[in-house]
Amino acid sequence: MDFKYDVIVIGAGHAGCEAAAAAANMGSKTCLITMDMNKIGQMSCNPAVGGIAKGQIVREIDALGGYMGLVTDRTAIQFRMLNRSKGPAMWSPRAQCDRGKFIWAWREILENTPNLHIWQDTVEELIVENGEATGVMTCWGVTFHAKCIVLTAGTFLNGLMHIGHKQLAGGRMAEPASYHLTESITRHGITAGRMKTGTPVRIDGRSVHYDLMETQDGENDFHRFSFMSEPRKLKQLQCWTCFTNEEVHEILRKGLPDSPLFNGQIQSIGPRYCPSIETKIVTFPDKPQHQLFLEPEGETTQELYLNGFSSSLPMDIQLAALKKVPAFKDLVVYRPGYAIEYDYFDPTQLKHTLESKIIKNLFLAGQVNGTTGYEEAGGQGIIAGINAHINCHGGEPFTLGRDEAYIGVLIDDLVTKGVDEPYRMFTSRAEYRILLRQDDADMRLTERAYKLGLVKQDRYEHLCSKREAVNQIIDFAKTFSIKAALINDALESLGTARLTHGCKLIDLLNRPQITIENIAGHIPAFKAMLDQITDRKEEVIEAAEVLIKYQGYIDRERMIADKIHRLEAIRIKGKFDYNSLNSLSTEARQKLMKIDPETLAQASRIPGISPSDINVLLVLLGR
């Protein structure tokens, strides 16, 4: 059998789903190949989406016309906005989801996406002709031809799971690994490596003593992941927290000789910011306890996920240690925690479009690029899908800058700096956090995606109405004058200083004690104007208030970003033989030859490139 498509996507995880949907929605005839149609969009580890910096990425995916935010809102069983005590640049949405419903929500979307066909099979070989990816062959002997291939294979490439001394081949528990595909790619010159991740035990909730834990409730305000205001339909559930203790740690320490992480069985590097419980007790031997979070797997299941107890120790040691936690003294588990090693490809071999520099029309996204996390995968997936479509049908490459999106920061870090451990996004990785807030992802990105043809008319009209309402509030605040005598009693009741003379409303709103909501009731004209906003009123008010209170910081950060843009405009790719530039340091020559940066700004971000190296390049360019 022989099939022809514009775009083929290999793997239906979070990167693959977004890539396939983006390419198909833009008009490419697309085929999504997955080993198991019942595992589309599977949450391989914790049943949650979002978190610090990750939540911003999900909102960016949504603003671009992707689906992770919509799927999350439809299947959320608990929502929280993290970092509320900090400024809005740090606010990050997070939701617990129903794992089973999450899969079926994704499948329903994909099965109803025009131009998209799903095929259940395992890809074994990438077909490359004259340096271009032209198709794939599957284990069933089916050949698929395409103009572009997007590889989103997650942890399945030569996946190997570890529980104690026991090793099992597979990409996830009870699921087969993918063989031969890595080798069919590396034979063309692409470099591969190995990484490791892990997951904790899954618990039978009927065996837990909930009265011995602290509850953690969600929030029920207006916040969502999607800007399309998807209502929450599922029952909102609690999470719980508890702690390990010295008895737990002692059992774990005795089991270390049987730990694949410490007996030499696992050589790959795992995620720094999601360490196993055995790594925690070795790295922090003086810490008497570690916090654990018990998270529901769904609305109608007893299965619970134990966040904070990732482990690859033998099953009996995991269980014995957990039973020393009072809430788990009668614990029953569904399956143990395990570690998994898998292949990834050096992301410095990619362009910012996520197309390979070595094999034309081959795109890579997700964990195959050395990242960890559903959100990071989804963000890469939508960019890869967009650019695969553009490669097929023509147009300018679509990339996002570091001042435009966390997705832009993520991809620039990958292709410029590379990875030596699984990469996770944090707000600290972004230079322009106040420009990349979760509340304005639509303002930043939706119009660009609309011009691409990815965002539909209804979403674009949503953006336009929101922008108009936000500007209306800000314009009113800038022009409306307030007399001191009419507002001073209200100001005093709100805990802020009285006025000595009249002022503009915006001057009051810049006070920390004053919000749009608490002052509007004292200014009838302002309240009447706000009452005219009927569509997503709370979201509009929040967006306007952030812009009013933080405008000075926003302007300052934009000015810094604009200065960096001048370096972004200086293109250097193909202009130098770095090896012959003796005025550069040896390290700089080696790094510049490897990365081959597109612009001077990208060169400046390469680890090991000093300001003096950049000055050398500027001089050679005649600047």
From Swiss-Prot:
Family label: Belongs to the MnmG family.
Quaternary context: Homodimer. Heterotetramer of two MnmE and two MnmG subunits.
UniProt cross-references to InterPro entries, sorted A to Z: FAD/NAD-bd_sf, GIDA_C_N, MnmG, MnmG-rel, MnmG-rel_CS, MnmG_C, MnmG_C_subdom, MnmG_C_subdom_sf
Chain sites annotated for binding NAD(+): 270-284
Gene3D superfamilies on file: FAD/NAD(P)-binding domain, GidA associated domain, C-terminal subdomain, tRNA uridine 5-carboxymethylaminomethyl modification enzyme MnmG/GidA
Protein name in UniProt: tRNA uridine 5-carboxymethylaminomethyl modification enzyme MnmG
Entry's localization field: Cytoplasm
GO cellular component: cytosol
Keywords from the named record: Cytoplasm, FAD, Flavoprotein, NAD, tRNA processing
Gene from which this protein is expressed: mnmG
Superkingdom, natural source: Bacteria
Cofactor: FAD
Gene Ontology biological process terms from the UniProt entry: tRNA methylation; tRNA wobble uridine modification
Binding annotation for FAD: 11-16, 123, 178, 367
Cited SMART domains: GIDA_assoc_3
Function: NAD-binding protein involved in the addition of a carboxymethylaminomethyl (cmnm) group at the wobble position (U34) of certain tRNAs, forming tRNA-cmnm(5)s(2)U34.
One GO MF term: flavin adenine dinucleotide binding
